[in-house]
Amino acid sequence: MSEVPRFELRSKRKIGKKQKVDIFGDKDDESMLQIDCETDSLISESVSSTHSYEDYSKAYKELTLETPADVNDSASTIVDSVCEESWYDKTIKDEQTKEDKKTDKKLKRIEKVKENNQNDSMSLQIAQLSLRIQRIESETKLKTLDSAYNTIITQADNLTTPQKKSLISAILATMR
């Protein structure tokens, strides 16, 4: 047998070493991040990726070192005057109104379900009664037509020719 030819597609990029990037500027193992680098990738990609991590670490350091500029203003916004309601009371009232609305909605849903159940039970009874009436009507029609048809067929052999003609004319007269 002939050997099956194998095609191997070589990738242009080769996975190289892992590069360690310091995120927070500390020399700890926790702040170090390992990144897979491609050896054949463009130099600008590796420079831009490390540059963005360096920017991130610088921005993080700046944010951690920053302190609020106006401490007095922030403290004055927390403390409310005596005449106004506190934010805690406002939030409690808001939560209570939301809960009241939810319970009202639930009660309305329950009432609608009860009304629908009553309406459904009435409509169900009406549907059952109408089905009974239809069944009784169909049974009585079938009995009368079937019985008449069967008697005609069984006794048609015993009839004379003028009797058969008169039977046919009577049937045609009732069909009009």
From Swiss-Prot:
The keyword Lyase does not apply. It is found in: Host cytoplasm. GO terms for biological process: viral genome replication. One of its GO terms (molecular function) is magnesium ion binding. InterPro entries: Rotavirus_A/C_NSP5 (IPR002512), Rotavirus_B_NSP5 (IPR020244). Its main location: host cell. One of its GO terms (cellular component) is host cell cytoplasm. Keywords: Glycoprotein, Host cytoplasm, Nucleotide-binding, RNA-binding. It comes from the Viruses. O-glycosylated. Homodimer. Interacts with VP1. Interacts with VP2. Interacts with NSP2; this interaction leads to up-regulation of NSP5 hyperphosphorylation and formation of virus factories. Interacts with NSP6. Belongs to the rotavirus NSP5 family. Plays an essential role in the viral genome replication. Participates, together with NSP2, in the formation of viral factories (viroplasms) which are large inclusions in the host cytoplasm where replication intermediates are assembled and viral RNA replication takes place. Orchestrates the recruitment of viroplasmic proteins such as capsid proteins to these factories. This is Non-structural protein 5. It comes from Rotavirus X (strain RVX/Human/China/NADRV-J19/1997/GXP[X]).
